[in-house]
């Protein structure tokens, strides 16, 4: 029996599946534990020995659908449901 190239063809079962917390394919099915974020533990798994890896998955590297708009909404005090007042037509034409 060989333990090298020939044996790799036998590997057909997935040991990891998608994690519901971090979304990565790091959730170990038999252990029921995510290797990336340590789900279902309450504290998220982060180590400082891999600074570059933290930089890859930190806030701002994804879509940020909500957080992207927060600074703009903060300027107006998070007001919603109001309409802009109509501008004076005379001021716009003379300027």
Swiss-Prot record:
It comes from the Eukaryota. A zinc finger (C4-type) spans 19-37. Signal peptide: none annotated. InterPro entries: Ribosomal_eL37, Ribosomal_eL37/eL43, Ribosomal_eL37_CS, Ribosomal_zn-bd. Binds 1 zinc ion per subunit. Keywords: Metal-binding, Ribonucleoprotein, Ribosomal protein, RNA-binding, rRNA-binding, Zinc, Zinc-finger. GO terms for biological process: translation. Gene3D superfamilies: 2.20.25.30. GO terms for molecular function: mRNA binding; rRNA binding; structural constituent of ribosome; zinc ion binding. Transmembrane segments: none annotated. One of its GO terms (cellular component) is nucleus. Binds to the 23S rRNA. Belongs to the eukaryotic ribosomal protein eL37 family. This is Large ribosomal subunit protein eL37y. The lineage of its organism: Eukaryota, Viridiplantae, Streptophyta, Embryophyta, Tracheophyta. The gene is RPL37B.
